[in-house]
Design a protein with these regions (language model features):
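Active-site proximal beta-strand in glycosyltransferases
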Residues: 85, 103-140, 165
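Short His-centered aromatic/hydrophobic patch
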Residues: 88-94, 113
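A short, glycine/small-residue-rich beta-strand->loop->alpha-helix junction that serves as a flexible
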Residues: 10-26, 88
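Membrane-proximal helix-turn-helix segments that form the acceptor-binding/catalytic region
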Residues: 133-167
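Extreme N-terminal starter segment of soluble prokaryotic enzymes
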Residues: 2-7
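A short, charged, and often flexible helix/loop element on the N-terminal side
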Residues: 54-76, 88-90, 136-145
Length: 167
């Protein structure tokens, strides 16, 4: 069996003490390491911590994914490390388009969705109508949100369609 080179991409550090995605990624990475795969983590908003990561961690130079230097560093990393698979652990969000800009041939991208992409959209009205506090100002804002609901829902729908058509 051919052992692949795999990178897990996530905006922040994949410290298993921080949350569920981080914990699961850490477990999977350790299992794959034991089976002989080469694993890396790629981040663009990682804060320094004291966790001893089991794999090399690559930080993009800027947290702004539109920075051209990030794309150059990203593609050089993929080529130099002969990456076969990119596992995008942030599939619902901003990194998806950036990670797809692979200039190296035969690299597979797997985007993982860790929650329901339409969850917020399906419950938007209830969220918009919830009073944040009992002030007059909040009640006026609630009325404004009521009248803006259709427009906001349309904008969110368009954004979801564009994002998931892309994926």
């Amino acid at each position: 069996m051919i052992k692949m080179n795999i990178v897990f991409a996530y905006p922040t550090g994949l410290n298993p003490q921080k949350g569920g995605v981080e914990r699961i990624t850490d477990i999977i990475a350790k299992i794959l390491l034991k089976r002989g795969y080469t694993i890396f983590y790629l981040n663009w908003k990682r804060e320094q911590d004291n966790y001893e990561y089991p794999v090399p961690v690559i930080d993009l130079p800027s947290s702004n994914l539109e920075d051209p230097n990030n794309l150059e560093v990203y593609n050089r990393f993929l080529k130099e490390n002969r990456i076969d698979v990119i596992i995008n652990q942030h599939g619902l969000y901003e990194g998806t388009y950036f990670l797809s800009q692979v200039k190296v041939q035969n690299v597979k991208i797997i985007s993982v969705l860790h929650s329901d992409p339409f969850g917020y959209y399906n419950h938007l009205f209830a969220d918009l109508m919830t009073l944040r506090d009992s002030s007059i100002k909040e009640k006026v804002k609630r009325v404004a949100r009521f009248f803006l609901y259709r427009k906001v829902k349309k904008i969110i729908h368009r954004s979801l369609v564009n994002h998931y058509t892309f994926i």
